[in-house]
């Protein structure tokens, strides 16, 4: 893998997910994380790591976390890869 041009740690709020129906909250959280990274990293090509998915779905679809801490890396080709940031 090439060197990362930009690397940021974001704390992504997922408050708005609670407005979705209970059975859609997990999927909505993943979509919101991807949309946040598209907006802040200025790239449409966003890949989420398996660890982010596991964290969101940890308590099931109806109870995603209120916020999530993510490390995002943007590469030369414009691709953004995101993984769960260690605390």
From Swiss-Prot:
GO BP terms: cytoplasmic translation
CDD domains: Ribosomal_L31e (cd00463)
Keywords, comma-separated and alphabetical: Ribonucleoprotein, Ribosomal protein
InterPro entries cross-referenced by the UniProt entry: Ribosomal_eL31, Ribosomal_eL31_dom_sf
GO terms for cellular component: cytosolic large ribosomal subunit
Molecular function via GO: structural constituent of ribosome
Signal peptide (from-to): none
Superkingdom to which the source organism belongs: Archaea
Cited HAMAP family: Ribosomal_eL31
PANTHER family reported for this sequence: 60S RIBOSOMAL PROTEIN L31
Family classification: Belongs to the eukaryotic ribosomal protein eL31 family.
Protein name: Large ribosomal subunit protein eL31
Record organism: Methanoculleus marisnigri (strain ATCC 35101 / DSM 1498 / JR1)
């Amino acid at each position: 893998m090439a060197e990362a041009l930009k690397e940021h740690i974001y704390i992504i709020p997922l408050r708005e997910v609670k407005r979705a129906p209970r059975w859609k909250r997990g999927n909505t959280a993943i979509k919101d994380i991807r949309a946040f990274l598209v907006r802040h990293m200025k790239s449409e090509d966003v890949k989420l790591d398996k660890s982010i998915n596991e964290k969101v779905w940890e308590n099931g679809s109806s109870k995603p976390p209120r916020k999530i801490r993510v490390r995002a890396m943007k590469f030369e080709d414009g691709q953004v890869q995101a993984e769960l940031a260690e605390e």
